[in-house]
């Protein structure tokens, strides 16, 4: 095992519950939290704030290397906080405009490499919970516990539907299911860091499991590895 602070990686497709599980686990253990999926949005948002063109690879690389961000695990039932340069940007980075910018910066190899190193810098004592799609395969391949959390596309669409309806949004379950299936295909077929479980990952299907049941399974794996 690495002599560095321990890392638990939680990878999986959109809607699998990995963000919720990661946040609750980080809060329970008192460990740091990394929401890797938010980093590209944060970089695009920060670049716009500093007047940096989203095609300027060198300046984006420099911004990525020094991204001042903190993820604060939320209480059960609440959203995590994302703090950028001392400001809560949890909601503003979720806009379509920021999302489009995130896609642009994610296509730049030098930026991806800089963010890879920035993600690894989150690894500090007492430990880190890293949530994403390639945490166990690319970012922290030596993590002592890797979890790959999934659920059926239908269940993930249902969860998203209930989440959006709860916010008062008018959404179609069938269209959400189509979106999730399309995203799954993009994520698993992409050339760079495709979505797949690490060879040594614990695979959990949460379709029929509650969040607490998923957490209990992870606690058992942590105990087996003397991490708690």
UniProtKB/Swiss-Prot annotation:
Main location: cytoplasm
BP-aspect Gene Ontology terms: nucleobase-containing small molecule interconversion; pyrimidine nucleotide metabolic process
Cellular location(s): Cytoplasm
Coiled-coil residues: none
EC number, as in UniProt: 2.7.4.25
One MF annotation (Gene Ontology) recorded for this entry: CMP kinase activity
Record-level GO cellular component terms: cytosol
InterPro entries, alphabetized: Cytidylate_kin, Cytidylate_kinase_dom, P-loop_NTPase
Record has Nucleotide-binding as a keyword: yes
Alphabetic keyword roster: ATP-binding, Cytoplasm, Kinase, Nucleotide-binding, Transferase
Listed NCBIfam families: cmk (TIGR00017)
Name of the protein in question: Cytidylate kinase
Source species: Pseudomonas entomophila (strain L48)
């Amino acid at each position: 095992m690495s002599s560095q602070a321990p890392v638990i990686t939680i990878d999986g497709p959109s809607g699998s519950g990995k963000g919720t599980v990661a946040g609750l686990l980080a809060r329970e253990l008192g460990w740091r939290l990394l929401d890797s999926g938010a980093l590209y949005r944060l970089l695009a948002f920060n670049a716009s704030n500093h007047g940096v063109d989203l095609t300027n690879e060198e300046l984006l690389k420099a911004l990525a290397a020094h991204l001042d961000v903190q993820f604060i695990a939320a209480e059960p039932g609440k959203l995590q906080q994302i703090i950028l340069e001392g400001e809560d940007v949890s909601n503003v980075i979720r806009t379509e405009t920021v999302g489009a910018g995130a896609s642009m910066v994610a296509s730049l190899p030098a930026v991806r490499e800089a963010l890879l190193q920035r993600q690894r810098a989150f690894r500090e004592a007492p430990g880190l919970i890293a949530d994403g799609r390639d945490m166990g395969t690319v970012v922290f391949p030596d993590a002592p516990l890797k979890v790959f959390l999934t659920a059926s596309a239908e269940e993930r669409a249902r969860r998203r539907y209930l989440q959006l309806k709860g916010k008062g949004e008018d959404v179609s379950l069938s269209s959400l299911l189509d979106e999730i299936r399309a995203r799954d295909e993009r994520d698993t077929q992409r050339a760079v860091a495709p979505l797949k479980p690490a060879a040594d990952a614990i695979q959990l299907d949460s379709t029929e499991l509650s969040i607490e049941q998923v957490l209990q399974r992870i606690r058992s794996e942590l105990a087996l590895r003397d991490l708690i």
